[in-house]
């Protein structure tokens, strides 16, 4: 679950702290005549005209967008008048209107609905966009104006948000290399171009390798345990790939694969686990091992050039964690108890295998299957009992939306008149409690072969009172689409994901800021997952669950005893879940705490040794992502930042306790959370926002209790 919980994008204006303006400041060039990207969409809230946008529109719009922004930046940098907040900082906030529109639209479509043409454009534009960013942030005249304002910021009589914006711009320039010598700036530009190209290659390799690695089986019997609908879908997928009469089991992003929980055939489970873990290291054209080494080295070189010990130190300085010591401490303290719990869980699973006279030791491919058996014994239910109560439309309308209405007073109305890029995409108007339209919400729920894996939120239009814009946000999930006429039944994890991603959407839709630099989810990476994690609590809140968890055939509510078992089982398998997450987080840190001279030559050997060194080398529980398909770390914006989910969960667990103390699903609670935190975006230090909401700093005890790490 990522926001970045969003597709892998290079939204230049966002990354640079520049505007999400939707108004072109200069007349589009003749080359853009008839190009729908040339001007802001005339649809409500500047919603993209998906029916008019074609692949061939992007490259000329990119070129003109970069030209326009550089012209605007040149005018700011060479302004003969002394620097003022308005003629420098605000002017930069308003720059790049066309480029922002092009890059936002392209990045979102390339994540959700890509093709070979878009992939080729991405490969071509990534280094060009990196160079474009360098041309702005390494402009000495522009930095001189920013620094002049920064040095006298206390005497400028700026309001709090404006002062924070000035400070952020100064920080952004310094971190981008504005203080480097001319020679070192040229070195940095070259490194940035290399990184941009490599990250694009990594992303495309992961998607292509994941598709190419789908497991093909010969007989229906081998898929025993999967539902008839799932097996029929596997047959249809195989036929679509020219393998008529066979069955194709597609892969998801993570190491673990959903069918592993139900497949009865151990040989098939082992094959499925093996192809998942081998992705990106098969020796073919999509092998990512050399790409990983080059990315790690380039990032380490960038950090060294900027004066940091390693890339993690550079990356974390700008997060709420601030340094590697804090992250290493958190992850290190949790690793041993988490693995101990996982070993205890493995013993429970082995006992079931032995009782069944299985004659084998539990391996990674067996874990989910026997976990379900133990869950069924201990709590007397399994996933298949839950799914009939989790029909997609009920979950979204009567669950996710219902909770938001009860908490915040917002309402939703589906509309069919706006264009979409895929027929399965749905669009909703979102209205505030006073009846005024707040935002437009796009729901893209189904998996597709041309859609990146995982789940994320992104914004097509970001809220800003300076620019007069309101939010157009989208949630993307990867729920397998059932055969025509069959209901879409979700797993419990998919239900939680739907609530999680809508937490990101609320963060975007509730944004009430002046400057686009601070809009919505424009907060530190280790804070951005916090509001979305909080929103997960409503998935099993009794009033909410009773409203949506109804049998898709009979409409009967989920029996209370089944709900009680679901809630009672929440700590179950936490050893596994915490260990697989920690293993990935620690790998992410290990790769990014290397100096250029320490980059290894063998990716898999380094990975194995790192897991051993960190005490999380427990074979039945592989990392949630192995290095060669770890998109968060090597292309998805979470480099040296995968720890952020756990860091944010500390805030989340503490906030859940606050909601419970205050009576839970009450409008006054939602209004307080919205006013103090969700609406504020990045207008203040993230931990100040938390303190203002909670009345104190966060404590870790609720997280330890949730994860079963208290030793009780």
Where does each model-flagged region fall?
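Short, hydrophobic/amphipathic alpha-helical patches that form generic packing surfaces
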Residues: 97-108, 167, 171, 274, ...
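Short pre-active-site segment immediately N-terminal to the catalytic Zn-binding motif
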Residues: 480-499
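Surface-exposed patches in mature extracellular/periplasmic domains of secreted proteins
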Residues: 75-80, 84, 311, 413-417, ...
């Amino acid at each position: 679950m990522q926001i970045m919980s969003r597709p892998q994008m290079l939204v230049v204006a966002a990354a640079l702290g520049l505007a999400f303006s939707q108004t072109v400041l200069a007349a589009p060039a003749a080359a853009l005549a008839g190009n729908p990207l040339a001007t802001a969409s005339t649809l409500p809230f500047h919603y993209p005209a998906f029916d008019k946008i074609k692949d061939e529109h992007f490259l000329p719009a990119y070129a003109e967008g970069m030209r326009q922004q550089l012209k605007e930046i040149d005018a700011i940098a060479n302004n003969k008048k002394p620097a003022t907040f308005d003629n420098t900082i605000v002017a930069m906030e308003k720059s790049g209107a066309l480029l922002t529109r092009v890059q936002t639209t392209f990045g979102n479509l390339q994540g959700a609905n890509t093709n070979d043409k878009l992939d080729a454009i991405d490969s071509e534009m990534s280094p060009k966009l990196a160079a474009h960013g360098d041309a702005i942030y390494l402009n000495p005249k522009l930095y001189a104006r920013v620094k002049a304002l920064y040095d006298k910021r206390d005497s400028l009589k700026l309001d709090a948000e404006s002062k924070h914006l000035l400070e952020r711009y100064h920080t952004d320039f310094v971190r981008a290399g504005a203080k480097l010598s001319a020679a070192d700036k040229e070195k940095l530009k070259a490194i940035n171009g290399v990184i941009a190209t490599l990250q694009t290659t990594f992303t495309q390799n992961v998607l292509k390798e994941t598709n190419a690695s789908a497991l093909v089986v010969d007989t229906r019997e081998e898929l025993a345990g999967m539902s008839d609908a799932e097996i029929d879908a596997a047959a249809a997928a195989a036929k679509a790939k020219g393998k008529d009469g066979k069955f194709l089991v597609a892969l998801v992003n993570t190491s673990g694969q959903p069918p592993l929980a139900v497949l009865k055939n151990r040989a098939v489970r082992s094959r499925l686990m093996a192809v998942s873990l081998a992705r990106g290291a098969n020796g073919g054209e999509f092998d990512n091992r050399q790409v990983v080494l080059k990315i790690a080295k380039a990032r380490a070189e960038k950090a060294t050039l900027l004066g940091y010990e390693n890339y993690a130190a550079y990356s974390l300085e700008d997060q709420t964690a601030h340094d590697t010591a804090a992250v290493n401490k958190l992850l290190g303290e949790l690793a041993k108890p988490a693995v101990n719990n996982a070993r205890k869980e493995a013993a429970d699973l082995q006992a079931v295998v032995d009782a069944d006279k299985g004659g084998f030791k539990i391996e990674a491919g067996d874990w989910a299957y026997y976990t379900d058996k133990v869950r069924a014994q201990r709590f007397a239910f399994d996933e298949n009992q839950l799914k009939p109560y989790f029909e997609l439309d009920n979950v979204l309308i009567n669950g996710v939306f219902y909770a938001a209405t009860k908490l915040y007073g917002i309402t939703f109305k589906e509309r069919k008149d706006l264009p979409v890029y895929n027929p399965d995409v749905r669009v909703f108007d979102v209205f505030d409690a006073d009846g005024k339209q707040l935002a437009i919400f796009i729901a893209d729920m189904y998996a597709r072969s041309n859609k990146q894996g995982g789940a994320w939120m992104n914004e097509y239009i970001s809220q800003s009172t300076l620019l007069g814009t309101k939010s157009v946000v989208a949630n993307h999930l990867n729920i397998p689409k059932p055969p025509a006429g069959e209901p879409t039944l979700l797993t419990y994890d998919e239900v939680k994901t739907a609530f999680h991603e809508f937490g990101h959407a609320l963060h975007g839709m509730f944004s009430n800021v002046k400057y686009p630099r601070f809009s919505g989810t424009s907060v530190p990476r280790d804070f951005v997952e916090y509001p979305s994690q909080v929103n997960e609590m409503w998935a099993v809140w009794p009033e909410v669950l009773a409203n949506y968890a109804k049998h898709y055939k009979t409409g009967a509510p989920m029996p209370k005893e089944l709900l009680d078992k679901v809630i009672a089982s929440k700590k179950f398998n936490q050893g596994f879940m915490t260990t697989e997450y920690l293993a990935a987080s620690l790998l992410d840190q290990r790769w990014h705490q290397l100096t250029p001279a320490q980059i290894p030559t063998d990716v898999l050997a380094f990975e194995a040794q790192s897991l051993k060194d960190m005490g999380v080398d427990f074979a039945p529980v592989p990392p949630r992502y192995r290095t060669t398909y770890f998109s968060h770390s090597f292309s998805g914006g979470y480099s040296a930042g995968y720890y952020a989910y756990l860091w944010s969960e500390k805030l989340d667990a503490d906030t859940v306790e606050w909601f419970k103390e205050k009576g839970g699903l009450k409008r006054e609670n939602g209004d307080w959370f919205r006013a103090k935190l969700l609406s504020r975006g990045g207008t203040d230090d993230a931990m100040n926002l938390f303190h203002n909401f909670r009345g104190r700093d966060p404590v870790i005890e609720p997280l330890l209790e949730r994860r079963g790490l208290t030793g009780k």
